[in-house]
Design a protein with these regions (language model features):
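N-terminal segments that mediate ammonia production and transfer
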Residues: 1-89, 103, 116, 130-136
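Phosphate/diphosphate-binding loops
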Residues: 7-18, 143, 147-182, 186-197
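Short glycine-rich phosphate-binding loop at a beta-alpha junction
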Residues: 92-98
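Short helix-loop-beta junction
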Residues: 111-123
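Short, structured coil segments at secondary-structure junctions
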Residues: 118, 139, 182-184
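Short acidic loop-to-helix transition motifs that present clustered carboxylates
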Residues: 124-133, 151-153, 176-177
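Short glycine-biased active-site loop of nucleotidyltransferases that positions the nucleotide triphosphate
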Residues: 133-138, 179-181
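Conserved small/polar residues in nucleotide/adenosyl-binding loops
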Residues: 198-205
């Protein structure tokens, strides 16, 4: 398994040969592309004492949730550790949470926490419907896109629409090398580790 990858933009393509790869733009001109090294770890997929991986991933939720919380919450000082946030909080008056499937249900739950802990107005949208409505984009709204894999097609399409309108976009994903993470202006990884089953536990966390 390789840990090197090159991302193609829309219209670009490549020809894979025995010992090298050639990249071209949509006009057919040869171009140079950067090769990136992914932060992948060689993990052993072991069920341990569990009968199957689903039981294992469900039982591991408390540990996974703890890892995610510890990444962003300083429990000793009762503070939030989110670094390099690109906007001032005074520039944000509302939040729109966008997701599909179980990620959408996670957004519904997150709405209650936002309203409980902040004074922000919060809306939740199903990604598949978001881009078909007549959206009134607002510069003071933070659009948060939730996707475990970071590759959910409808969620990415909603993100792309927001980017076209130069909105504030944030990704909540498990895979930091994913399309949604790469094209969002800010990323909050949830640090769930490798998911074999893609059950709803990763999105819910």
């Amino acid at each position: 398994m390789t840990n090197k990858i090159t991302y193609l933009n829309d219209g670009e393509f490549c020809i894979v040969k025995k010992d090298h790869v050639e990249f071209f733009n949509e006009e057919g001109d040869k171009i140079n592309k950067k090769v990136l090294e992914l932060s992948l770890e060689d993990e052993k997929y072991d069920k341990g004492d569990y009968k199957h991986f689903m039981a294992k991933e469900i039982e591991e939720q408390p540990t996974t949730l703890k890892n995610g919380i510890n990444e962003y919450v300083d429990t000793l000082n009762n503070d939030i550790n989110i670094y390099n946030f690109p906007w001032k909080m005074s520039e944000i008056s509302s939040v729109t949470l966008i997701g599909c499937g179980t990620a959408y249900h996670s957004c519904l739950l997150a709405k209650y926490w936002f309203e409980e802990l902040t004074s922000l107005d919060v809306n939740v949208d199903i990604a598949s419907e978001f881009r078909y409505r007549k959206n009134r984009f607002k510069k003071e709204t933070l659009y948060i896109f939730v996707s475990q894999s970071g590759e959910t097609a409808d969620t990415y399409a909603a993100l792309d629409l927001c980017n076209q309108n130069d909105m504030k976009t944030c990704a909540v994903v498990n895979v930091i090398e994913s399309s949604i993470a790469r094209d969002s202006k800010f990323v909050l990884p949830i640090h769930c580790g490798t998911c074999l089953l893609y059950t709803s536990d990763a999105a819910d966390e």
